[in-house]
Amino acid sequence: MAGALAGLAAGLQVPRVAPSPDSDSDTDSEDPSLRRSAGGLLRSQVIHSGHFMVSSPHSDSLPRRRDQEGSVGPSDFGPRSIDPTLTRLFECLSLAYSGKLVSPKWKNFKGLKLLCRDKIRLNNAIWRAWYIQYVKRRKSPVCGFVTPLQGPEADAHRKPEAVVLEGNYWKRRIEVVMREYHKWRIYYKKRLRKPSREDDLLAPKQAEGRWPPPEQWCKQLFSSVVPVLLGDPEEEPGGRQLLDLNCFLSDISDTLFTMTQSGPSPLQLPPEDAYVGNADMIQPDLTPLQPSLDDFMDISDFFTNSRLPQPPMPSNFPEPPSFSPVVDSLFSSGTLGPEVPPASSAMTHLSGHSRLQARNSCPGPLDSSAFLSSDFLLPEDPKPRLPPPPVPPPLLHYPPPAKVPGLEPCPPPPFPPMAPPTALLQEEPLFSPRFPFPTVPPAPGVSPLPAPAAFPPTPQSVPSPAPTPFPIELLPLGYSEPAFGPCFSMPRGKPPAPSPRGQKASPPTLAPATASPPTTAGSNNPCLTQLLTAAKPEQALEPPLVSSTLLRSPGSPQETVPEFPCTFLPPTPAPTPPRPPPGPATLAPSRPLLVPKAERLSPPAPSGSERRLSGDLSSMPGPGTLSVRVSPPQPILSRGRPDSNKTENRRITHISAEQKRRFNIKLGFDTLHGLVSTLSAQPSLKVSKATTLQKTAEYILMLQQERAGLQEEAQQLRDEIEELNAAINLCQQQLPATGVPITHQRFDQMRDMFDDYVRTRTLHNWKFWVFSILIRPLFESFNGMVSTASVHTLRQTSLAWLDQYCSLPALRPTVLNSLRQLGTSTSILTDPGRIPEQATRAVTEGTLGKPL
């Protein structure tokens, strides 16, 4: 309703002057400044006869309210002469539909250029009128409906508004109709509030910006219409209840007459959910069934990666409600057989070759595909590592540390070295990425483990890492350690509390270790501390899935089992080669290397058959530097990407479709070999597909030519048949209708014999002449129809004449015509005594059968 509100604003701001000479029916006259400011737009958009016309322009029941003229500035914005009455608008609507309006179905308003939203608004009003009349059983003031079964009662709805016009085309400017529309809406809003909401009136609100206090313009606007709401002048001030125009116009959707607004309206009053609670002025639709983005964001975490986390603050976090599901989800699928000591203080030992990198993204939305393409790292041969696809967010690199004697050259770690490798952590680090994964129920024997907390504050110079997917590299500890290595420790505490969004998943503990007094403060690696604490607890990353062939039984010897602490490594931004399809892990013997191998593990989709917890965690051996134990030699574990299974299924589907396509092509060529005579004559001869198609085309061309010849021959035969039928019809038309023709001489002879017999009999009795007049038509028909060629023919034609001319339906008109002739040619009606004389004269003078 942007255009409608624009019209309302124009009606509020502009003073009223004399009417324009080009509008002979407008009751609301506009200011010339309004016309100049609006340009030719408002002058050109007029409503012609039949649309929103007014029959009696000056018949308002209430007097028009006029405000004093004066300049209106931005700070003096207020209501200017809004007519609360609806008389003219009702007349307009009733005029437009004063004929036979039988249903509230959709109307296109032909002849009036309206936008689709304007048509919707008007059709809603028509539907509401139907609802008021037939459902609420009240008379609608807008338009009346009539059913075809009402008969004469339907004339009551046909009001003679159009007759009152007497051919005058009232042209009303669009802004006048807009103002009347707003008066109509405000009127209904006040009617809804007046009878039952006197105790529930909204408290007066002071509008923002340049709005004047509602005490000044609400009274001016509504006091003459709704004294119950605003009170009379003589009413005590304490009993007066104020009303905000925002309350009245809150349900008015800004959709009507938007064609008159060229730019954005300066006044945007209605909210987004207009007409939610007003059933009297809105047509029911499917809006409540449409999904809401706000609701979707409340119940879904699909878009959580686009939300930046809050900077972590040092604090003590409460104990999570349950740690068993987290451990179960971490070591699910029963692949890497975890041996977790049940000691209360488990430690994680980081080797000298361990590297920790956290991918940090700049503030901005993150694509969820970044997680789907991220990888976990597990040991593999020194083959080219398969990196995940590059991620748009940049990496947050820290200055590389100085080279340490005894270390192999490796990529510069993003974090400085922290402590000698002899230092052990007091608590295992928490790994709680931002992406949620479903957890499975805890397996028997999984005991809750403590988690670190109370991390030191993060320096302000280090930006907070965004919760993004990051891989994990597991490096074995069974090899010689260098003199120095990055290690860190964290104070004992409680794990982070659940996030405000109400998720209950706890951050999984990635690797417990042996207990030892901490030798290094957690502040030595602030980014890691920030990384481990900033992520939301409810979003637990899916644990790596390893083939069950790599599992080691808990009771097996553990002296030669290398230890794998968890480290983080960012993926290399290089093109990703295709991965093998998912399946059992590919095992290959490894050769000794100076640098420990790394296992690379992708976070695949959770599989129900693989999500099993290996071993009883409570039955694991006691203190020991253990993260994940894998029996040497270290195998290569190759897992596909999360979409590798989908890719493999798609590849199999494509192969099947290709095989089916080729089979259909071969079947089609075999069919062609059987149909084409030139090819079927030599079945043993191998013919190429091109030759087969060529021979088939020639064969089809030959068949088409033969078919054309047959069609031409059939057409010629049809033409001959039509010519013969025409000749037969012509011969039949030349034959007589009665069979054997009778000569005209014979007709005359029979008529002379009939006249002589009538003359003789009339001289004896004059009544026979009357009988001859009645019988002459039958004699003429008998003489023309009966044939005397043979006795058989005489019999047949006589019976046919008897059936055709002597039946009562045929005799009645014949006798009637004879009597009419007797009455007109003789004086039987006027002077019956002269009939014998007239009969004798007729037979002697030869006037038989003719009028006397």
UniProtKB/Swiss-Prot annotation:
Main location: nucleus
Subcellular location, record wording: Nucleus
Biological processes annotated in GO: anatomical structure morphogenesis; energy homeostasis; fatty acid homeostasis; glucose homeostasis; glucose mediated signaling pathway; lipid biosynthetic process; negative regulation of DNA-templated transcription; negative regulation of oxidative phosphorylation
Modification note: Phosphorylation at Ser-556 by AMPK inactivates the DNA-binding activity.
Disulfide bond sites: none
Residue numbers of Phosphoserine PTMs: 20, 23, 25, 29, 196, 556, 602, 614, 631
KW DNA-binding (keyword) present: yes
Presence of keyword Phosphoprotein: yes
Compositional bias annotation for Polar residues: 548-559
Tissue occurrence: Expressed in liver, heart, kidney, cerebellum and intestinal tissues.
MF terms in GO: carbohydrate response element binding; DNA binding; DNA-binding transcription activator activity; DNA-binding transcription activator activity, RNA polymerase II-specific; DNA-binding transcription factor activity; DNA-binding transcription factor activity, RNA polymerase II-specific; DNA-binding transcription factor binding; DNA-binding transcription repressor activity, RNA polymerase II-specific
Span of domain bHLH: 649-703
GO annotations of cellular component type: chromatin; cytoplasm; cytosol; nucleoplasm; nucleus; transcription regulator complex
Top-level taxon: Eukaryota
Region described as Leucine-zipper: 703-724
Biased composition, class Pro residues, residue ranges: 568-584
Pfam families (UniProt xref): HLH (PF00010)
Sorted UniProt keywords: DNA-binding, Nucleus, Phosphoprotein, Repressor, Transcription, Transcription regulation, Williams-Beuren syndrome
Span list, region Disordered: 1-36, 54-80, 328-365, 486-527, 548-648
Assembly with partners or alone: Binds DNA as a heterodimer with MLX/TCFL4.
Functional description taken from the UniProt entry: Binds DNA as a heterodimer with MLX/TCFL4 and activates transcription. Binds to the canonical E box sequence 5'-CACGTG-3'. Plays a role in transcriptional activation of glycolytic target genes. Involved in glucose-responsive gene regulation. Regulates transcription in response to changes in cellular carbohydrate abundance such as occurs during fasting to feeding metabolic transition.
Clinical condition linked: WBSCR14 is located in the Williams-Beuren syndrome (WBS) critical region. WBS results from a hemizygous deletion of several genes on chromosome 7q11.23, thought to arise as a consequence of unequal crossing over between highly homologous low-copy repeat sequences flanking the deleted region. Haploinsufficiency of WBSCR14 may be the cause of certain cardiovascular and musculo-skeletal abnormalities observed in the disease.
Protein name (database record): Carbohydrate-responsive element-binding protein
Lineage: Eukaryota, Metazoa, Chordata, Craniata, Vertebrata
Gene: MLXIPL
